Amino acid sequence: MGWKEAAAPVLTRMPAVERPEGHVPFRRKMYWTGGVLVLYFFLTNVPLWGIQTAGNDFFGQFRSLLAGGQGTVLQLGIGPIVTASIVLQLLGGANLLGLDTDNDPRDQAIYQGLQKFLVGVMVVLTGAPMVFLGNFLQPSQQLAQSMPGGAFGVEVLIFAQIAAGGILLLFMDEVISKWGVGSGIGLFIVAGVSQSLVGGLVFWEGGVGSQGLLPTWFDIIVGNVSNMPPLLSGSGIEFLLMQAGILGLLTTLFIYVVVVYAESVRVEIPLSHARVKGARGRFPVKLIYASVLPMILVRALQANIQFLGQILNSTLASMPTWLGVYGGNGQVTGGLFYYLAPIYSPNAWMWWTSGATAARWQVLIRIAIDLSFMIIGGAIFAIFWVETADMGPDATARQIQNSGMQIPGFRKNQGVIEKVMERYIPQVTVIGGALVGLLAVMANMLGTIGNVSGTGLLLTISITYKLYEEIAEEQMMEMHPMMREMFGGGD
């Protein structure tokens, strides 16, 4: 008996959100999407009951990307979902699952059940060390005195809350995927990054360097900034670029323009209908063919590596210096985990500034590792993404063949169409994945409004762009119901 036969009775009965029986009207989809987003914002502001303080956010640079809230019910964010996706993509890429998710409905149900099971496992593997080992969430000593089991009982209560939040986020994503518009994970990332961007623009407390861009410039204009250097001097230019937020603003605008332009760059393969004379179309192969979503997987892998370092630092009595050196604030400052940590702000690599602590050679090695990790990892995960999302040459050729279309000048044969697609899709996938990885590192190094991670900004712009396209498509199907069949919208 294989693993499928043994696991099928359990995996096919995993809880799931029921699929709609027919076409869901656009307005109802927007209601579902808006309702889930309101619930998401509510949960990111519900503090965990039983913690002493939220503590230092050791994963602040990944917070917007993982769409979580420090010290809240959504402490884990989409981390377990993304990590489970990484495991599934690696297993599927190595052909170890033996599942035909394209043609066999039973294998599809097993795959979806396996995904939910792995998410549950990752919730435990991520949440348990965070509560019981890492001291990231300190239990309230006052509550521990009146709680059965003392501090351990409070820790169990905290773990139950973040585990429930992680599982609830999985089903919220499923609700949007089946009943709403877009992807739940994508919308949660957009929501988290948008909060940071708005705060980076209008936050009015904390003084220059820690408040928003608009209040900072208001203080500069009215002369409300103490010890401000002459603006035309070297220190004044550094002040304008770094503390006044000019560099972050320019980087944000630059990334926005590049991503929107890259989304519009495409190779269009002409198509014609085999039976309907004059019916023509084009199949677009975009420069960012795999989208920027594979970057979530790359950054999540980096986040898990840093999480392992934090766990080792808090549990080992004396951590080897070659492995990692951690400061009083919990941030890594040396060792292997330092070089594997992503660059997430200008201060992390500008060794000539006053706040720099690392030597030039250390910074250069770290930049080289981060660039290599993101560019190579972006290309590899883009390939995995294309294959698992049925966007590869074989799946695309099959979809074109089944739609009755063909490439003019070629025989109406799936193998012929596949060979034409192989000229473009694999190469564009690798180039697009590497380009997105490079842009993510550049955005992190130069800084953005609200200190949003470069990957989070890339994802937000790209997801918003695709969401706009999806909404336009949905409205077209509402206006012309006959278009649903062409887009696969059902009855």
From Swiss-Prot:
SUPFAM superfamilies: Preprotein translocase SecY subunit. Keywords: Cell membrane, Membrane, Protein transport, Translocation, Transmembrane, Transmembrane helix, Transport. It is a multi-pass membrane protein. GO terms for molecular function: protein transmembrane transporter activity; signal sequence binding. Residues 48-58, 135-152, 203-244, 314-365, 448-452 are extracellular. It comes from the Archaea. GO terms for biological process: SRP-dependent cotranslational protein targeting to membrane, translocation. Residues 1-20, 88-109, 178-183, 267-291, 386-428, 468-491 are cytoplasmic. The chain crosses the membrane at residues 21-47, 59-87, 110-134, 153-177, 184-202, 245-266, 292-313, 366-385, 429-447, 453-467. GO terms for cellular component: plasma membrane. InterPro entries: SecY (IPR026593), SecY/SEC61-alpha (IPR002208), SecY_CS (IPR030659), SecY_dom_sf (IPR023201), Translocon_Sec61/SecY_plug_dom (IPR019561). It is found in: Cell membrane. Residues 59-66, 67-78, 79-87 dip into the membrane without crossing it. Belongs to the SecY/SEC61-alpha family. The central subunit of the protein translocation channel SecYEG. Consists of two halves formed by TMs 1-5 and 6-10. These two domains form a lateral gate at the front which open onto the bilayer between TMs 2 and 7, and are clamped together by SecE at the back. The channel is closed by both a pore ring composed of hydrophobic SecY resides and a short helix (helix 2A) on the extracellular side of the membrane which forms a plug. The plug probably moves laterally to allow the channel to open. The ring and the pore may move independently. HAMAP family: SecY. Component of the Sec protein translocase complex. Heterotrimer consisting of alpha (SecY), beta (SecG) and gamma (SecE) subunits. The heterotrimers can form oligomers, although 1 heterotrimer is thought to be able to translocate proteins. Interacts with the ribosome. May interact with SecDF, and other proteins may be involved. This is Protein translocase subunit SecY. It comes from Halobacterium salinarum (strain ATCC 700922 / JCM 11081 / NRC-1) (Halobacterium halobium). The gene is secY.
